[in-house]
Amino acid sequence: MLIDMACAGLEKRGIDPKNDEVTYCWHYSQATVTDQNSWQVAGEAIIKEEYPNWTNVAPDNYYSEQDAEKAITIGEAVLAAHPDIDVIICNDSTALPGQLQAAENKGYNQDNITITGFASPNAIKEYCSNGTLYNWGLWDCGVQGAMGCYLAAYMAAGNTVKVGDVISIPGIGDCEVLANESIAEGAATAETNNGVVLLPETSVYTAENMNDYNF
């Protein structure tokens, strides 16, 4: 999803993600945050396989430790070190608005840089309205909450789950229980009542649909 959004932003600028030389980097909270790090690792694998023409100009990544002010400072440091960078991926809801604010401070917009990542619609709408980015994503928090409540009630009712089980959640669909290792390399999973259930869908926001969401 992150790479797809980056590609869409590049194409909006007339850059061919498959054939043009593209420079990019990652800016998020820190390498020890399981979900964010797993997204970065998965994204790198996609880039390596499908976009060998992309160059990561900061393989050690940029980290702002979920600090809003630091996210702006680090964001400005990224742009100072790589003023012609094509893509900045912010797989963290604090890093993304900070990077966007840094871009505005330095005179960038969606026509000369592609910044994308994960954050709530309300946190980013202003930057999108300003023309600083083309798209960003997350998930529908209502669906997330409904899944969490249903699974909690399902197990509280005495049901036992294990990796490989498929749970049918009304109004959402069939969801498979995955091993913890699916999001955290080397993580153990207990035999029962343990594992990961992923949201069946994620959401991509643009100027066209961002006002359909209020969270």
Where are the regions a protein language model picked out?
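A residue-level marker of the well-folded mature domains of exported/periplasmic proteins
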Residues: M1-F215
